Regions:
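A glycine- and charged-residue-rich anion-binding loop/surface
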Residues: 1-222
Length: 223
C-alpha cells in the first residue's frame, strides 16, 4: 500500500484534487495515466473503480498495478504536467454506501447465523451477496430489520491499521493470514472486517437496506 499518495484513504470525501502526471502511455484501453497523488479509487475489494475527469478528459477505469494506480483516460498528458482530478461523486458515494451496507448485512448474518460471505458483487443498481449457509425468508427479513435499526442508530464507522501483535489478538470476520498493512473496518455492534474499500463515516449515511430477493445458491443463500 502506498498510502501517502492515496487521497481516498486520507479522506474518502475528497471530490476534487490537483496532482502531477508522472507517467502517460497509450494502451489498449486509451491512455494509461499515473499521478503523484490521486483520489480515484481503483477497483478492488469488491468495490468498482471510480470514474470522473482529469483536466476535463474522461477517466473511465482505474486499476492498481505493480507500478502503482493507473487511470485509464481518453486523453494523453505530458509527464510533469499539473492536472486537476474531479470524481463522479454520485457514483463514488453510491459505492461507499453500498460497500458499508454490505459490511453491516454480512456482519449481522455472521453474528446471528455463523454464515460467511463467500461472494460479493456490486453494480450500478443491485448488490448480490452469497452466504455459506441456507437462510429462510424469515431469517433474511430479520437481518434486514437489524441492518436498518443500525442505520437509524447512525453508528460511526472506524478505520484502523493494527500492528502485527494487535492484529493477531483482534477478532474480526473472515480472519485469515494477510501480508503487509491490514486495514480494519469496524462498524460497532455490526461488523469488523479487513477491507481495502472506501466507506461512509457512519451508518446513517447508508440510507436504507432493502432485500429485493433471496434464494438457495450452491448450498447456501444468495441475497
Amino acid at each position: 500500500m502506498t498510502a501517502m499518495t492515496e487521497l481516498f484513504y486520507r479522506d474518502p470525501y475528497v471530490r476534487e484534487f490537483t496532482s502531477k502526471v508522472i507517467s502517460c502511455v497509450e494502451g489498449e484501453k486509451g491512455f494509461e495515466v499515473m499521478l503523484e497523488d490521486t483520489a480515484f479509487y481503483p477497483e478492488g475489494g469488491g468495490q468498482p473503480a471510480d470514474h470522473g475527469t482529469i483536466d476535463g478528459a474522461a477517466v473511465f477505469d482505474v486499476r492498481r498495478t505493480p507500478a502503482g494506480i493507473v487511470h485509464y483516460c481518453e486523453k494523453a498528458f505530458d509527464v510533469g504536467q499539473d492536472v486537476k482530478g474531479v470524481l463522479d461523486w454520485e457514483r463514488r458515494f453510491d459505492n461507499m454506501q453500498n460497500h458499508t451496507g454490505e459490511h453491516v448485512f454480512s456482519g449481522i448474518v455472521n453474528a446471528r447465523f455463523g454464515f460467511d460471505n463467500v461472494g460479493f458483487h456490486m453494480d450500478d443498481d443491485v448488490i448480490t451477496c452469497d452466504f455459506s449457509g441456507v437462510m429462510t425468508e424469515e431469517q433474511v427479513a430479520e437481518v434486514e430489520r437489524a441492518c436498518n435499526e443500525a442505520i437509524v442508530a447512525n453508528v460511526e464507522v472506524g478505520i484502523s491499521f493494527p500492528d502485527a501483535e494487535a492484529l493477531e489478538k483482534l477478532a474480526y470476520r473472515s480472519k485469515k493470514a494477510l501480508k503487509g498493512d491490514v486495514r480494519i473496518v469496524d462498524v460497532p455492534g455490526c461488523d469488523r472486517c479487513a477491507c481495502c474499500g472506501v466507506h461512509v463515516r457512519s451508518t446513517g449515511e447508508i440510507g436504507l437496506i432493502k432485500v429485493l430477493s433471496s434464494m438457495k445458491h450452491r448450498g447456501g443463500t444468495r441475497v
